[in-house]
């Protein structure tokens, strides 16, 4: 399969205070999120001037991709400007015929994969005749470079702790929670199992035999079951058991979303300080050059029909495959 362009497809985020509420309404439309929760998250964004940190990160990643790939690189978002629909129209007008789509989500699942596939389909319909073929690259939660970046981040975070606490620090992984029903929708529990498997790979690479896997940033009605335990609740459990230091690894995020810089760096750190627990947060990949190399590796798999590159050579948690033009791949959890 030959590509004449690449498209970085991300989540999107506001670029100013006046954009925050419309952005959040875009993200949560149809999800039955209480208005009080939107009010709360609005304050989180306004704390940072109403600007999402992922905007600058994505532009930096586009630059890294342009260095790594011998292709023009376009950029579009699912939930905010530049929308993927507008980007694909531009690609059509530029004469692009077939583009590899790299999404800033490492996982399978409805929220982390299927909704991006749906966005690709919408964008091609909007572009109409002459729309380029869009090939979404596979999830990469077990790619060696994905694991390596988080291993290095944990090692650096541990080094930032007081020397006397490093050996006893508890490693805590966290990812964005979703409703249990949503996790089962592309099941059985595909998203949570992939996160768990990636955490196991990263912990082993960083030299940790024991760790905790937690979830964060739930936003739905309180009566709806979401993935648990919550990272804050687990922190309090650890503190009560005498844990003196934690290393929090946001393995579910490939960039510093507001859920990282507010929910973890602000709220969770404050909780840890109040409980007398030393806190270190591992970095996300952001615009690490290795992230661009990872994208190039996925493109190479399709261009040269190579076996997917995985840490252990096989996929014990079968995920989505590459998909074309917004059509789900052939696996049962995608077409069900």
UniProtKB/Swiss-Prot annotation:
GO (cellular component) term, any one: cytoplasm
Protein EC: 4.99.1.9
EC class: lyase
Gene Ontology MF terms in the entry: ferrochelatase activity; metal ion binding
Family: Belongs to the ferrochelatase family.
UniProt function note: Involved in coproporphyrin-dependent heme b biosynthesis. Catalyzes the insertion of ferrous iron into coproporphyrin III to form Fe-coproporphyrin III.
Protein's name in the database: Coproporphyrin III ferrochelatase
Gene label: cpfC
């Amino acid at each position: 399969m030959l590509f004449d362009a690449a498209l970085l497809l991300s989540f999107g985020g506001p670029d100013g205070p006046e954009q925050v509420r419309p952005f959040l309404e875009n993200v949560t439309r149809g999800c039955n999120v209480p208005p009080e929760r939107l009010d709360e998250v609005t304050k989180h964004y306004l704390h940072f001037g109403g600007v999402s940190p992922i905007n600058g990160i994505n532009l930096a990643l586009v630059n890294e991709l342009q260095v790594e790939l011998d292709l023009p690189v376009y950029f579009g978002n699912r939930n905010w400007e530049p929308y993927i629909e507008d980007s694909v129209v531009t690609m059509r007008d530029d004469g692009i015929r077939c583009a590899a789509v790299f999404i800033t989500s490492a996982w399978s699942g409805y929220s982390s994969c299927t909704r991006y596939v749906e966005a690709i389909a919408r964008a091609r319909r909007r572009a109409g005749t002459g729309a380029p073929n869009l090939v979404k690259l596979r999830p990469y939660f077990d790619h060696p470079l994905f694991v390596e970046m988080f291993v290095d981040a944990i090692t650096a975070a541990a080094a930032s702790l007081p020397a006397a606490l490093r050996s006893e620090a508890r490693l805590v992984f966290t990812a964005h929670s979703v409703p249990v029903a949503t996790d089962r929708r592309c099941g059985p529990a595909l998203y949570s199992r992939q996160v768990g498997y990636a955490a196991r790979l990263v912990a082993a690479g960083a030299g940790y035999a024991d760790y905790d896997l937690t979830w964060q940033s739930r936003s739905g009605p309180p009566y709806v079951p979401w993935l648990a335990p919550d990272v804050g609740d687990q922190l309090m459990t650890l503190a009560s058991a005498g844990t003196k230091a934690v290393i929090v690894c946001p393995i579910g995020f490939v960039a510093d979303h507001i859920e990282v810089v507010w929910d973890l760096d602000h709220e969770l750190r404050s909780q840890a300080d109040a409980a007398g627990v030393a806190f270190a947060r591992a970095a996300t990949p952001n615009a690490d050059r290795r992230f661009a190399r990872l994208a190039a590796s996925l493109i190479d798999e399709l261009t040269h029909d190579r076996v997917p590159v995985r840490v252990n050579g096989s996929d014990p948690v079968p995920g989505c495959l590459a998909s074309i033009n917004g059509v789900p791949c052939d696996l049962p959890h995608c077409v069900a």
